[in-house]
Amino acid sequence: TNFGVLASPNATLEELHLLQKLARRLGIENLDCRLRQQDFSLDAAGILAPKLNHSLPEVESLSDVLLVGSYLRKELPMLNHRLRKAQLNSKHISVINPVEFDFNYRLTHSLIDNDLVQNLMGVVKAASELTGKNDQAWLKKSIKVSPEQAAVAKDLMAAKNGAIMLGQIAQVDTHYS
């Protein structure tokens, strides 16, 4: 018989890691925590799980971070702690979220709107205008760039080493991929 493990998407990364170690020790290879995910179209391209392309110490050295659809304080407390340390060292942290959360560090920019995709597209369009590479047809559509979106794009473009991180709220969005 085949067994599987379904883990809560509310579990922390640390809890999920320990659960998969236990499951594999018991010979269970079928694990999934994407219970709320609605868009699986990236699976065909081999993108099965989001990943952090930085070590935790490297996160502290990022000069600018944009969090999209995330409340790291609850999602990934250890990563949140590293970002807090970075912000205390004058690094910029901005967010695009559907609601305002109680972050334990000062945010440089806070774009609060239910439509994460529209807000992110505004930042992308502003960045493309800054680079002069505005040749994408979808960017020429009626995407209006707000001053706050332009400021986020300007900070990210000026950053020596910046990052955009997608959180759990973004991952359960119907337009995730």
Report each predicted region and the residues it spans.
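Catalytic alpha/large subunits of respiratory electron-transfer oxidoreductases
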Residues: 1-177
